[in-house]
């Protein structure tokens, strides 16, 4: 029989670190939050190898007093709260007192800091949670934190880190989340010694367009207040700009599935930066150590605030209903003809069919995605590259320094996905595109592949393109269009699931219906 025994301090540290630090982007998040909480107006961030080799954050904030430096890396030590009541009136980003403890437990960690009232600074060095040195050093006012070789002492966790590019994309998203909202701070971001972003203080709209230059002149402002709180921000009017939107609650980037559902239902897939302001007691950030998830005292009131705010936009967004079938038709006949009765369309989402004694509710987007996926897979070359077509006129699109770096990092995947292109200064010049993509769709699909950290294989890319080319929930289908989709669906190799594994249909047995209403 195995006996129960207490864990070692070393193992406790590593387990605790896993709750806060899963990848380099988590480290970056915590360090940026600390720098902002320190009252900085300038923050420089240096990343190497996607954060796997180094993350360094330098700020000009108030610094840490030497007497507090040894305490700042202990668990549950913080200057930001002192009582339970403080949890319900939090104005700072950090408050749990776990971040530096966790980070220093799984890295080679150093912190140099100097308050304004002292002439010299102090440097603390910790390696894998073990104290190494605490020395006096020359330093400017502020704090510099260096995190090297993350997970060097936990090889299993290190093994699960993704590629340098994937980890950097996660770091980049984290950086953007905080750079967008903190417009009074001058941010600079470097990767592998190269400056990618230089964001001087500005207003919110300018900050967004500094980060995403292609949105200049293409942002719609929102500002709405009710008895619950306020929602404000900007929404892209550019249909081609397909990046994940950002939601802030009291200036903290958060994830809330229900809010995102509401937003998507009203503005479709457009990019947005939305801020929700609520009384502090209305929000519980203390749900998870990462503080990304959030709960509300009154979910319904917050949902209504978001819903009514978006409905109040001067230019309401309407879902488009154009969905030309742009890929080549499958070669050969349809095989054995399937006899079915098309009953109609429900909520512009489900095609309803009577077939072989049963009723089928078929998800129109999912079924079309399955058809497109199989047709596109037939257009692969033998070497695994997607076939290309030459454009009559090159597509030229201005790009930022950041996008330029990402394109260079992901050049191989983009080329395998059917794109041939050059970079001319800060212009992307596309010469060839996948055979099944129209010129109007080319830029959208190019940037979807670029910004999706999972888009490494051609199979995955084809799944994403099939999704993009397919009819959407909310599109109105003519009977002819619905019948064409159904005929093509019946001949697919895997009719039950879409490429992402979602079921295509739900079957209702007529016999079960008869039994339920007493006719069985």
Curated annotation (Swiss-Prot):
GO molecular function list: ATP binding; ATP hydrolysis activity; ATP-dependent DNA damage sensor activity; mismatched DNA binding
Record InterPro entries: DNA_mismatch_repair_CS (IPR014762), DNA_mismatch_repair_MutL (IPR020667), DNA_mismatch_S5_2-like (IPR013507), HATPase_C_sf (IPR036890), MutL/Mlh/PMS (IPR002099), MutL/Mlh/Pms-like (IPR038973), MutL_C (IPR014790), MutL_C_dimsub (IPR042120)
Family: Belongs to the DNA mismatch repair MutL/HexB family.
Protein name in UniProt: DNA mismatch repair protein MutL
Gene Ontology terms: cellular component: mismatch repair complex
Origin superkingdom: Bacteria
Keywords: DNA damage, DNA repair
